[in-house]
Amino acid sequence: SSAASDVYKRQVHNEDYFVKLAMQLEKMGADTICIKDMANLLLPYDAYSLVKKLKANVGVPIHLHTHNTTGTGDMTNLMAAQAGVDIVDCALSPLANGTSQPATESLVATLKGTSRDTGMDLEKLSEIAAHFRKVADKLDINPKVLKVDTNTLLYQVPGGMLSNLISQLKQANAEDKYYDVLAEVPRVREDFGYPPLVTPTSQI
């Protein structure tokens, strides 16, 4: 079983909180601890520090799940790797970045020849990516969800919620209200006591 903890509002949930929670989850029988960075808010040096502390305090594998919404996902994964993270989530390049995960090929190339070499073959990954490039073209993905939006560092909206928001605004012919809606999110979250914006909260 994997226990996941969402990273969000630093003023409410700090590093010590997450380390203590991970230790409790391990005692309860978790086989892995997953840091779920639902909106790419975990910055690279914070990831390094958190993973280092988790590795020093729990014995089960540490798994990092982040996105590339704010454009720091690749750096966050790299710093987590330097700190000893056991697992990171990536996506093949045709389906990567923005509200998705950082690109697999980029991380594989970056770590090649280091102590964290993944052992993956870039040429084979390129062949697989070529297939999924055709799949991505058929999916007609809104290009906005694959772009970096550094405003996410302020609004803290997770990738899945962001892509759904864009779709709903498009259906309502209100795409021009996108940034107005995002600006309202932090105020509403504060009123509700800073809940994490993951299911079920993200569906409200």
Q: Where would I find each of the regions flagged by the language model?
A:
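Terminal or standalone catalytic/regulatory effector modules within metabolic enzymes
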Residues: 146-151, 156-204
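Mobile "lid/hinge" segments at catalytic clefts and subdomain interfaces of large enzymes
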Residues: 100-104, 111-114
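Alpha-helix-loop-beta-strand connector modules within alpha/beta enzyme cores
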Residues: 5, 47-64, 109-120
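Short, small-residue-enriched loops and turns at beta-alpha junctions
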Residues: 9-14, 37-45, 68-73, 94-99, ...
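Glycine-rich phosphate-binding active-site loops on the catalytic face of alpha/beta enzymes
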Residues: 83-100
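Short, small-residue-biased leader/transition segments that mark boundaries at the very start
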Residues: 1-8
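Alpha/beta enzyme core
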Residues: 9-60, 78-85
